[in-house]
């Protein structure tokens, strides 16, 4: 971009769009280095605004992290929705699980922002981040393709989410190779988890139905 256009873009930050610019710039930093790479002072310098300017939009770093994490979940949800709705011989749960594995490894900085920091856990109920994260969970529950029987779907969804997170974090650390992974690929391991989850849910639902009669 020519320098003259850059200066014009930076000047507009004082007229309302600095918030979006901060979120996008912070997102890029997280993409490269995870949540720890996000620094408000560095972002202000990068965007060419005064050090106090970001605080007109975000009370502190945590508030900025919350906005960036919400955006990450929204982008992730778009990916998941497209995959779940796309006709395929794979089950919806398999598509969800494999997409999560790929996202976690290929975009690990963003994944760690979403799942390996305290930001999501501290998000107030009803906040943009909370709503975006709950949409991810809803997509996982939908991908189970099972009727509602008590809270069995939700419980199995949380088990699956926890298992997937474990695989991503172990794989990211290089701990799922060779004999440590039983000689199977990460994708095969995740597919095993998918099949076991579907079987466990089916057994639990049949037991619940028998107990109801």
Regions picked out by a protein language model, each given a short descriptive name:
Residues 81-82, 114-122, 177-181:
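Short linear capping/connector segments at secondary-structure termini
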Residues 94-116, 161-172:
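Helical hydrophobic small-molecule/effector-binding pocket
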Residues 122-148, 154-158, 184-202:
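Amphipathic alpha-helical packing segments from all-alpha helical-bundle domains
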